[in-house]
Amino acid sequence: MTRKFFGTDGIRGQANSFPMTPEIAMKVGMAVGYIFRRKGQASRVVIGKDTRRSGYMLENALVAGFTAAGMDVFLLGPIPTPAVAMLCRSLRADIGVMISASHNPFYDNGIKLFGPDGFKLSDQIELQIEAMIEGDMTPFLASHGDVGRAKRVDGDIYRYIEFAKRTLPRNISLNGLRVVVDCANGAGYKVAPAALWELGAEVITINNEPNGININEDCGSTHPIGLMKKVHEVRADVGIALDGDADRVLLVDENGTVIDGDQLMAVIAESWAASNRLEGGGIVATVMSNLGLERFLADRNLTLARTKVGDRYVVEHMREHGFNVGGEQSGHIVLSDFATTGDGLISALQILAVAQEQNKPISDVCRKFQPVPQLLKNVRTTGGKPLENKRVKSAIDEAKERLGGQGRLVIRPSGTEPLIRVMAEGDDRGLVEKVVNDIIDVISSESSAAA
């Protein structure tokens, strides 16, 4: 069934444009509130947000929708996405909502939904919500005496800080570690520096002054250049880069080199396997993870199960097949022993634990494999279905034949933007670049011709 509102990570778009309008947000609140409201009992929803200016607008619209449906609302304020999932369980809420567009620019925003177990909603429930939004909302409204109330929650970030700190083994501290944290002017700007400092680290914080429009602006996990420079400047042991809602993380070693999610997953997988903590016989990653990671795991008799792009699909596979480590190259890392979704801070703490335990620099700990040459490029489209175009199909088939068994080709539409993502990898760097550029050229040409 074609989706009109939900993408791979909730509902997302430009603020004040369809579908990220106050009207739609209110209807989402009404529909979700009706579905999760417990008849005859007090029902509650927790709502968090990142630091985008439009968060205020959408927050108020959601409050109107949920209270109209008869649910009480707990407002958490600016807080990481994984904290919303955790607090949904901790506060025994019936539903959790995060207002965020993750790593996107400030002018975008989104709505992510979590069930009472802290996991993202199923496709079936999302389709049910879409159908309700499109119809008459009147039947979903509560009676006069059952309209909900709203209140702001105090101390919620401290609950999450304590939760995150407890994931670091008690016999390990961060004493003597100089850490630079890039908060992306986003939702982690309070919790990440506080947790690291309380665990003993010397913390130097950058991009921790959100003003509503500077979230992810030339900073955070999608723009780590500033962090690389700062680590070198202050001679830090490690840099930690979060994204706007702090559900993903990249590290920078003491030499100023970026360490992506694939390397981080390799560290955790090897460490947890050695201590018999790794479940499922391996880890779960997406089709975008590097072939080098797959080879590294295979050499240690560990498997790499691949899914579609999107941490929700990683989590679904983990739950269905008994894995406790999964993630994406982009830095979404899910450790189900601790969390139900990607958590940048907790993932970083697990890497720091390995480094402290082994008494080795981050550069030694996190260089587990030599990545296979990989190139990812995006091409913006003007609508339609370019991947069904005959010339595009022919170019893709030709590329697969040229790569043969020595590489991989992944082509997919973005779930959040009007883009086609083209990724190829293989041992021959020149061939990889040629394959990607040829496909990009054809898609761009055909898309322009169809416009």
UniProtKB/Swiss-Prot annotation:
Q: Does the keyword Isomerase apply?
A: yes
GO MF annotation, one: magnesium ion binding
Major enzyme class: isomerase
EC numbers for this chain: 5.4.2.10
As for PTM, the annotation reads: Activated by phosphorylation.
How does the cofactor bind to this protein, according to its record? Answer: Binds 1 Mg(2+) ion per subunit.
Task: Provide the GO biological process annotations.
Answer: carbohydrate metabolic process; peptidoglycan biosynthetic process; UDP-N-acetylglucosamine biosynthetic process
This enzyme catalyses:
alpha-D-glucosamine 1-phosphate = D-glucosamine 6-phosphate
Which Gene Ontology CC terms are recorded? cytosol
Where Phosphoserine occurs, the residues are: 102
**Cofactor(s), by name:** Mg(2+)
Keyword Isomerase set for record:
yes
Q: Which domain of life is it from?
A: Bacteria
Q: What Pfam family does this protein match (any one)?
A: PGM_PMM_I
Give residues annotated as binding Mg(2+). 102, 243, 245, 247
Keywords from UniProt, A to Z, are: Isomerase, Magnesium, Metal-binding, Phosphoprotein
What function does the entry list? Catalyzes the conversion of glucosamine-6-phosphate to glucosamine-1-phosphate.
Question: Which protein family is named in the record?
Answer: Belongs to the phosphohexose mutase family.
Q: What is this protein called?
A: Phosphoglucosamine mutase
| Native organism | Brucella canis (strain ATCC 23365 / NCTC 10854 / RM-666)
Gene this protein is translated from = glmM
